[in-house]
């Protein structure tokens, strides 16, 4: 049998409605929304002695940070995810949310060794205050941190075990975690700015060096959590209003589940959270993890996440990463080496980063095609230059070869003819050389012999007196073409007169293929473009005619005997 202490007399100004019940058996607590009544427990919650008579543990009905099913342990034992329940209290289906310790210390400011549920119980256990009177234990709030659970604030020394008055409950309820926000603001004001800046710098450097992540700063306007999620999902933090609206709509559609973790009226809570300047907490994180079916990882001055919110279905998608700073602000943690934008939006056959990869492939392909075309053009230019060079070399070789052939023929003619007619042979060879080097484009139509016979016939009476037939056009045409007429032959061929005009001269030239090559060559191959063809032909024609007349006169003198003077 439990012996209760005597009832203390109430102060004169005390409210009778707030007095504890008289000694005796505890009445059953009303089932107001399935709340968990918590008596003055041990060191983990209230600071007094734990009641070891009974304990009931609630369970999370779906994927969430709390573990599935009842927790093992002796009756009345305190766990990280459960609270000891005093005798007579009713345990509802609303479990307590997990609470990682804030950055101030492992158990939070004022937290004892067993205080694993938050940082707001400092001084409460020492005063022996009963926490959570006949109602649900609040989880999160307007400006709460990642997974910090809360208790209601009540005046020290005042509490009820099972049936507290509704008026006092409404006064003690307040916002869902307003006390933590006030405590966080007080801690921020007490911290040294230099220390805070150094801690932030270390946090960013550690994430970048170890994980390769980059902390992307979000605007500090109360919507930092939704801005961070919008940056992860849409790639634009200005989409935070859309993310907030979808999140609140999802909470309303699943109000039967999420209302178990809110101390105040759920509709009032949702209406307040729809404001763009209202902070988000881990209830919204859990909703967004289920809504986008992506885990939500929270980093707080550590390279490993302090809390992870899972969706309903497991997949291999990249998680939504956010960082928690100074217990009041969220930023987006971006992995620059892996695209996550668009994941979770329900787009069919969507592959993160596929558009960028496709654009990169197209750009590389276009660049390669342009480079190949440029190289082909350069090769064509080089081939054209090579061909032009080869043609120039071939023309030069052909010209030098032809001139050398002419010189060889002239030497052979001098050797065969002897000293009898050196002047005629040299003149004929020189005229042939000049005619060959003049660079005529049409050998068959522009013969110097034809032009001389047609335009300027000189001394026709001399030809009549001598009785010598001038060279026929066909013979002159053959002589005008390359090969030179200074080909080797007998002396009778040069003194035969009419027989020489009709004899076939083609047999005198063994290299007939050279003539075809020279006929196809342009005058530029010989470098004679700057010379006047008419002047060259006129000079050659004059020399040839003069030599021909001189030879005729000498032949006539030798044939006719001198007249008899007797």
From Swiss-Prot:
Residues with PTM Phosphothreonine: 195, 502
Entry EC no(s): 3.4.19.12
TM segment ranges: none
Compositionally biased tracts (Low complexity): 84-97, 425-438, 445-457
Keyword hit for Phosphoprotein: yes
UniProt entry tagged with the keyword Zinc-finger: no
Keywords of this entry: Hydrolase, Nucleus, Phosphoprotein, Protease, Thiol protease, Ubl conjugation pathway
Region described as Variable-loop: spans on this chain: 273-283
Modified residues (Phosphotyrosine): 175
Residues bearing the modification Phosphoserine: 64, 165, 177, 323, 332, 370, 447, 503
Protein name as catalogued: OTU domain-containing protein 5
Region (Disordered): 1-117, 146-175, 413-497
PTM annotation: Phosphorylation at Ser-177 is required for deubiquitinating activity. Phosphorylation at Ser-323, Ser-332 and Ser-503 by MTOR promotes its activity.
Regulation: Inhibited by N-ethyl-maleimide (NEM).
UniProt-listed GO biological process terms: CD8-positive, alpha-beta T cell differentiation; negative regulation of canonical Wnt signaling pathway; negative regulation of interleukin-17 production; neural crest cell differentiation; positive regulation of TORC1 signaling; positive regulation of TORC2 signaling; proteasome-mediated ubiquitin-dependent protein catabolic process; protein deubiquitination
Boundaries of every OTU domain copy: 213-336
Compositional bias of kind Pro residues: 11-30, 63-75
Catalytic site positions: 221, 224 (nucleophile), 329
Biased composition annotated in UniProt, kind: Gly residues: 32-47, 105-115
Region (Cys-loop): 218-224
Chain positions covered by the region annotation His-loop: 324-329
Compartments reported by the entry: Nucleus
Function recorded in the entry: Deubiquitinating enzyme that functions as a negative regulator of the innate immune system. Has peptidase activity towards 'Lys-48'- and 'Lys-63'-linked polyubiquitin chains. Can also cleave 'Lys-11'-linked ubiquitin chains (in vitro). Acts via TRAF3 deubiquitination and subsequent suppression of type I interferon (IFN) production. Controls neuroectodermal differentiation through cleaving 'Lys-48'-linked ubiquitin chains to counteract degradation of select chromatin regulators such as ARID1A, HDAC2 and HCF1.
Assembly: Interacts with TRAF3.
């Amino acid at each position: 049998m439990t012996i209760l202490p005597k009832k203390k007399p109430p102060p004169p100004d005390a409210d009778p409605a707030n007095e504890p019940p008289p000694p005796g058996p505890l009445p059953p607590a009303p089932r107001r929304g399935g709340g968990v009544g918590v008596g003055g427990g041990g060191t983990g919650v209230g600071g007094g002695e734990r009641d070891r008579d009974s304990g009931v543990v609630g369970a999370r009905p779906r994927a969430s940070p709390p573990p599935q099913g009842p927790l093992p342990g002796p009756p009345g034992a305190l766990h990280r995810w459960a609270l000891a329940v005093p005798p007579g209290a009713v345990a509802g289906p609303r479990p307590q949310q997990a609470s990682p310790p804030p950055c101030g210390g492992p158990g939070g400011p004022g937290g004892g060794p067993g205080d694993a549920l938050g940082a707001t119980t400092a001084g409460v256990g020492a005063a022996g205050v009963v926490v959570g009177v006949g109602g649900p234990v609040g989880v999160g709030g307007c400006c709460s941190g990642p997974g910090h659970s809360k208790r209601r604030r009540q005046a020290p020394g005042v509490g009820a075990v099972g049936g507290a008055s509704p008026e006092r409950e409404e006064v003690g309820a307040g916002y869902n975690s307003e006390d933590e926000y006030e405590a966080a603001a007080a801690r921020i004001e007490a911290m040294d700015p230099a220390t805070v800046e150094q801690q932030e710098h270390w946090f960013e450097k550690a994430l970048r060096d170890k994980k390769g992540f980059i902390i992307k700063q979000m605007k500090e306007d109360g919507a930092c959590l939704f801005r961070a999620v919008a940056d992860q999902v849409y790639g634009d933090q200005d989409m935070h209003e859309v993310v907030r609206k979808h999140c609140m709509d999802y909470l309303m559609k699943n109000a039967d589940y999420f209302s178990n973790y809110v101390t105040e009226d759920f509709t009032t809570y949702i209406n307040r959270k729809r404001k763009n300047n209202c902070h988000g907490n881990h209830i919204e994180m859990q909703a967004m993890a289920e809504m986008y079916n992506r885990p939500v990882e929270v980093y707080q001055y550590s390279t490993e996440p302090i809390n992870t919110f899972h969706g309903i279905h497991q997949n291999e998608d990249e998680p939504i990463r956010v960082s928690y700073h100074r217990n009041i602000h969220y930023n987006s943690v971006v992995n620059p080496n892996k695209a996550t934008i668009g994941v979770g939006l329900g787009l069919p056959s969507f592959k993160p980063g596929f558009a960028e990869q496709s654009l990169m492939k197209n750009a590389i392909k276009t660049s390669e095609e342009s480079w190949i075309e440029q190289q082909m053009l350069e090769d064509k230019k080089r081939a054209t230059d090579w061909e032009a060079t080869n043609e120039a070399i071939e023309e030069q070789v052909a010209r030098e070869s032809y001139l050398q052939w002419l010189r060889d023929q002239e030497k052979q003619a001098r050797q065969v003819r002897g000293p009898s007619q050196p002047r005629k042979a040299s003149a004929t060879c020189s005229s042939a050389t000049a005619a060959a080097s003049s660079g005529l484009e049409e050998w068959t139509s522009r013969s110097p012999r034809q032009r001389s016979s047609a335009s300027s016939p000189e001394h026709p009476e001399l030809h009549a007196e001598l009785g010598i037939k001038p060279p026929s056009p066909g013979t002159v045409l053959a002589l005008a073409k390359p090969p030179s007429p200074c080909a080797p032959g007998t002396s009778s061929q040069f003194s035969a007169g009419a027989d020489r005009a009709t004899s076939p001269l083609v047999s005198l030239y063994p290299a007939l293929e050279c003539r075809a090559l020279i006929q196809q060559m342009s005058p530029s191959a010989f470098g004679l473009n700057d010379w006047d063809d008419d002047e060259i032909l006129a000079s050659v024609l004059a020399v040839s005619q003069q030599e021909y007349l001189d030879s005729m006169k000498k032949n006539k003198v030798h044939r006719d005997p001198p007249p008899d003077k007797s």
